[in-house]
Amino acid sequence: MDRRRFIKGSMAMAAVCGTSGIASLFSQAAFAADSDIADGQTQRFDFSILQSMAHDLAQTAWRGAPRPLPDTLATMTPQAYNSIQYDAEKSLWHNVENRQLDAQFFHMGMGFRRRVRMFSVDPATHLAREIHFRPELFKYNDAGVDTKQLEGQSDLGFAGFRVFKAPELARRDVVSFLGASYFRAVDDTYQYGLSARGLAIDTYTDSKEEFPDFTAFWFDTVKPGATTFTVYALLDSASITGAYKFTIHCEKSQVIMDVENHLYARKDIKQLGIAPMTSMFSCGTNERRMCDTIHPQIHDSDRLSMWRGNGEWICRPLNNPQKLQFNAYTDNNPKGFGLLQLDRDFSHYQDIMGWYNKRPSLWVEPRNKWGKGTIGLMEIPTTGETLDNIVCFWQPEKAVKAGDEFAFQYRLYWSAQPPVHCPLARVMATRTGMGGFSEGWAPGEHYPEKWARRFAVDFVGGDLKAAAPKGIEPVITLSSGEAKQIEILYIEPIDGYRIQFDWYPTSDSTDPVDMRMYLRCQGDAISETWLYQYFPPAPDKRQYVDDRVMS
């Protein structure tokens, strides 16, 4: 699974559209755009032109691998790359009066080898000019870059861009597009976490995963005082092309992105992932196997939340399995889904480097009918926190054939909490541990005689307190094994209820156990549905080893 190695560092990218490829699809004009750093010829541009461009590009062969970078950039270390700074005095919207937003570009180099072209657009006239690379746009500091190798390299391009918001202009960015089709945003903590992608291809198939690239961006000049901007993107890959429109609202406590894409398949595609997101889960309250550090929990996200088309809410805690797992949850016109980080308590992480308690959640809200399909969740084994091991996306049911065209509209919310939540009782936390004894009576002189695994799921909110006098009933379904010693406990500190049960194996199978539970009262559901996947140990490991030394 070397496919993930670049995500936290130098992210690999796929195709790049050459200069002649894009330029030949533009009509020329004679208007001077108002961006000081835009130095290319004027070109007619709007979203319909971009759609035509992507459509026509899909009729041509993919251009394949990028050309080599100058040696001084190709051999850079991460430390050297990070020391390169864009000159804030030459930012994209530096001359906009009363600007609340500004944009800067990332330098090529290190693992960022596919050039991305940048254009400034006058939204009133629909005329664009390209922003060409030149060394004077950057401050190289002690990066050790031989700038003589960069002279005359106006077509070198950029690696990506980031956007800043007042009062932190040029200091703390709120949106970043960098590497392949990856992008991310922050909430009011300014702490980056999980990432989104433009598209995912063959994430879990017998084919090698394909990583499409955003190869060009067009920025509408931002209006004075505005906190919303629009950027368009051309996506290119061996199997597909796409035209994207991002309307990005940089609000006080969150970033909201309205996304519209038009996709054009070059080839048959086994697995097409829409609105994909990538995160990290090493260990948490439910999964302690890889938590032999000083940190109680290590994760960017703690759960997959789904609001199904039929109205059902589902909470699926994330895992760090010993073996790669892929699960697909069927749906029809989903109302929303996302990877959430709902535990915001610093004491639960004790991390002053990663600040996982500040990392945003990401919620996807479809804005048109997506039809039948599945929400795919892939969980990759990881030994630490430097590998993004969680992938989630929507996969349409319809097979993708060469020549097919698709259009999707959706909204992305980057925030501490999703914009909507289940009106019924919600899962607050999931915990697992040794079972086989009565709660509060873990034996001190010997281990339980029979091996079992305990699960404790905390529910809060909804009408739990009103339902309690009438009787709360946990409805538990298991794909294998038995649930015993089921208890319902009121937890005063959270003003909620803990449903606790022990899982006992009924066979020697080590296949994953799919667990499902919800609460009901007098026949009516009063909670969201909890889904979980447990990986039982081998039969010879289903015993407690007493390694105490008593003398």
Swiss-Prot record:
Function text: Probably involved in the control of the structural glucose backbone of osmoregulated periplasmic glucans (OPGs).
Keywords recorded for this protein, A-Z: Periplasm, Signal
GO biological process: beta-glucan biosynthetic process; glucan biosynthetic process
PROSITE patterns, A to Z: TAT
Stored InterPro entries: Gal_mutarotase_sf_dom (IPR011013), GH-type_carb-bd (IPR014718), Glucan_biosyn_MdoD (IPR023724), Glucan_biosyn_MdoG/MdoD (IPR014438), Glucan_biosyn_MdoG_C (IPR007444), Ig-like_fold (IPR013783), Ig_E-set (IPR014756), TAT_signal (IPR006311)
Family membership noted in the UniProt record: Belongs to the OpgD/OpgG family.
Gene that encodes it: mdoD
Pathway given in the UniProt record: Glycan metabolism; osmoregulated periplasmic glucan (OPG) biosynthesis
Organism: Escherichia coli (strain K12)
Subcellular location(s) of the protein: Periplasm
Extent of the signal sequence: 1-32
Keyword Signal: yes
TM ranges: none
PTM annotation: Exported by the Tat system. The position of the signal peptide cleavage has been experimentally proven. Can also be exported by the Sec system.
Protein name (record): Glucans biosynthesis protein D
One Pfam family named in its UniProt record: MdoG
The keyword Signal appears for this protein: yes
Gene Ontology MF: a single term: carbohydrate binding
A Gene Ontology term for the protein's cellular component: outer membrane-bounded periplasmic space
